[in-house]
Design a protein with these regions (language model features):
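Thiotemplate assembly-line natural product biosynthesis machinery
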Residues: 1-18, 71-73
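Conserved alpha-helix in the HATPase_c
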Residues: 39
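Phosphopantetheine carrier-protein modules
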Residues: 13-31, 48-61
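Two-component histidine kinase catalytic core, primarily the HATPase_c
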Residues: 36
Length: 74
């Protein structure tokens, strides 16, 4: 799932692939702002055919958090 998310981040959000690790923080390390986080959620929902529970969104701080959520729910 990390590779799928990594491809999405690189291709759709123009993130440098070298920055993408499970520990990378979306806002601090990848430079996302709140709008880009919302875009990421929408892209993941479309690509992986899931709906993110709004209550979990504030807990998605790292790439690893997103990967774990996708693995549990996709």
């Amino acid at each position: 799932m990390l590779n799928k998310l990594k491809n999405l981040l690189v291709e759709e959000m123009d993130v440098n692939s070298e920055l993408i690790t499970l520990e990378a923080e979306l806002m601090n390390d990848l430079g996302f702002n709140s709008l880009e986080l919302a875009d990421l959620v929408v892209l993941c929902e479309e690509k992986f055919n899931i709906i993110f529970d709004e209550s979990v969104l504030p807990t998605l701080l790292t790439v690893g958090d997103v990967v774990a959520y996708l693995e549990e729910n996709a």
